[in-house]
Curated annotation (Swiss-Prot):
Catalyzes the NADPH-dependent reduction of glutamyl-tRNA(Glu) to glutamate 1-semialdehyde (GSA). Keywords: Chlorophyll biosynthesis, Chloroplast, NADP, Oxidoreductase, Plastid, Porphyrin biosynthesis, Transit peptide. Homodimer. It comes from the Eukaryota. Transmembrane segments: none annotated. The gene is HEMA1. The lineage of its organism: Eukaryota, Viridiplantae, Streptophyta, Embryophyta, Tracheophyta. InterPro entries: 4pyrrol_synth_GluRdtase, 4pyrrol_synth_GluRdtase_dimer, 4pyrrol_synth_GluRdtase_N, GluRdtase_CS, GluRdtase_dimer_dom_sf, GluRdtase_N_sf, NAD(P)-bd_dom_sf, Shikm_DH/Glu-tRNA_Rdtase. This is Glutamyl-tRNA reductase 1, chloroplastic. One of its GO terms (biological process) is protoporphyrinogen IX biosynthetic process.
Amino acid sequence: MAGATSATAAAGAFAAAKARGPAAACPWLVAAGGRRRSGVVRCDAGGDAQAASKAASITALEQFKISADRYMKEKSSIAVIGLSVHTAPVEMREKLAVAEELWPRAISELTSLNHIEEAAVLSTCNRMEIYVVALSWNRGIREVVDWMSKKSGIPASELREHLFMLRDSDATRHLFEVSAGLDSLVLGEGQILAQVKQVVRNGQNSGGLGKNIDRMFKDAITAGKRVRCETNISAGAVSVSSAAVELAMMKLPKSECLSARMLLIGAGKMGKLVVKHLIAKGCKKVVVVNRSVERVDAIREEMKDIEIVYRPLTEMYEAAADADVVFTSTASESLLFTKEHAEVLPPISLAMGGVRLFVDISVPRNVGACLSEVEHARVYNVDDLKEVVEANKEDRVRKAMEAQTIITQELKRFEAWRDSLETVPTIKKLRSYADRIRASELEKCLQKIGEDNLNKKMRRSIEELSTGIVNKLLHGPLQHLRCDGSDSRTLDETLENMHALNRMFSLDTEKAVLEQKIKAKVEKTQS
């Protein structure tokens, strides 16, 4: 899978170059990396004394025009910084996991960083990825990595050995592949698309993700839907939950699979899917432990082909004592089962293999890895599901190649939309410039004619005439400023036209916009 390959390659490249120093170890921090390059000098208030602080503030403010002159031909970068099941073990991923209800706070903290304009967090059991629009690629990446290090308690140097960092079209393609299920442990699984949708819903409920990130995620959803509708990538595809059930069946004696006593802890979305796939395997009964009975009742109402027995969370260990297989899928940030718990559980019958199976699909994990040290217990987590999904690898690669055509089409549409944003300030400035002239000349004309000589209809007709003339005159220039992928005009041609109009009418939009961004960030830092 393309995204996974890129991610793994990035992590590998860092490890190989680490000994040669920071520049060699982090080529993605210094490479030009395509058309969209941007940067901004970091503006920090310095000095403890008031005079020193004031001097630093003045110096920072004076750097506006220097920074704008240096970077006015450049553009903010879209970046993704993250790790996944392909690049990092679950022990690291669980430390970085951000609960869904904390996404808004994480976004707020990220966008408060000096060089980050927009941000989004995608945190699942298999990945933790941060998408940002950075005013400066180098500084933005460094700030995000430092934020991740601070939140997880993992040194930045250790994090970089597992992180992948992708820029602009590579970052966008990666998100589209994630949404389509191409970067999932289980190719084509549907839950990741729902999780990408939740990022957008979460952003809408908390004040928005920012123009670029919001559009990118919405286009990623479109790409994910198209891949599933126009290819057979989802045919026979398994989810993390179904892979967990399959793994349990593989480890049980074949003759006893259907008679095994099944226990599920957690009745959320993942847990519900576990029940669904147990039914598909022919299981007739499952015990579900959950904090409240309402969710269990809802599952029971929907799935009538299996007997579902509810037990409260306070009876979890008693329920585990009566189970051959224990599936855990909760949002608990602490372990539910440790080695000490497993040691006091009664042994399993030899007919069932003599081993109690714990299949933990939670991140952070619910079951300690040390359980496997107990003679009659074995624990499997999400990383162990690779054993299940490695089957049919050739078919997985073929399906991924079919889906890439759709991914490329949607990527081009997004890139065309983003390219068109470069000319929007110029279009607005040109329209405003023309309208000011129109209004001024119209006022002169009306004064010459005299208000007493005009009725409302005549005045409206003259105003409409002036507006029509301006629109006709602007139509040609504005057409040459549009770059939405609908014609053969290249971005370079469009930008050349934009710069020409800026010079002719002294619009100087790019520089003004960037100066405003720098000023806003500096004032925020100084306050």
